[in-house]
Amino acid sequence: MSELTPDELALLRGVFDLARAGDADALAWHLDAGVPANLTNGQGDTLLILAAYHEHPDTVRALLERGADVTRTNLRGQNALTSATFKQDVETVRALLEAGADPDAGTPSARATAQHFDLPDMVKLFG
């Protein structure tokens, strides 16, 4: 396995920044050019987890359309649905649920997060 060059590392860091910033078009371009949709940083955060946490539903949808895995968790056991639930981002939660995210997956799960923080509107979304 070859190591990444400084330029390649900078490009990948930039891709994570696009997910955090919600630049769906630029992120989609990079994914279409070959960057993996399930790219993960050193904390285990995927592009999808970061986009969900930073409340970017269009970016979340762009990632889902390109194969991002809704079941992936970071090193703390958190997933994109838990992140969106914590932020009370209804649009992102709906997009993730429509893509098959399980509200009972992860540690803590999205459902447990909603219950812990007394977020009844989020709990209702889980059915």
Feature-to-residue mapping (PLM):
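Ankyrin repeat (ANK) core detector
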Residues: 13-16, 46-50, 79-82, 112
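Conserved ankyrin/ankyrin-like repeat signature
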Residues: 26, 58-59, 91-92, 121-122
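Intrinsically disordered, low-complexity regulatory segments in ankyrin-centric signaling systems
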Residues: 1-33, 42-45, 127
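Ankyrin repeat start-site detector
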Residues: 10, 42-43, 75-76, 106-109
